[in-house]
């Protein structure tokens, strides 16, 4: 399985809400731990990742610093529009350590992923790296279709999530 969170796989950041030449958004997908994108204050902040075609998502992992609340959304569209929420998570602050959060969606497809940083533990947050494992497909999977035999992959109907809980959407 290819890591779709890397520019080497054909993925790229096509939109970011802030830009600092020293910490550009492209650092999110360069695969290096010594580079990162720094959001330049005020919330929400966001970036949109274009995948190299339609993929079934098996795992999405993101490494951040100072992020408090994050929303992960996807779209099957050929353009970065009409995003649907996958999960919302409140992250614990870890002074001097990166936060690593992993989502294991079941039967979800995406052409684009949008990561919205809704709030932070400090005025500035950073996104260091992401890893996205998935399989190429030609058939989009609708968010309205229930997963086959498994629970947990539905649109989030409310934003309240328990602190420290898994990065998995609740059953609607």
Residue ranges and their predicted role:
Residues 54-55, 78:
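Short, charged/polar surface micro-motifs in flexible loops or helix N-caps
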Residues 32, 46-51, 57-62, 100-135:
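Hydrophobic/aromatic beta-strand segments within beta-rich folds
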Residues 83-103:
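Extracellular carbohydrate recognition and processing domains
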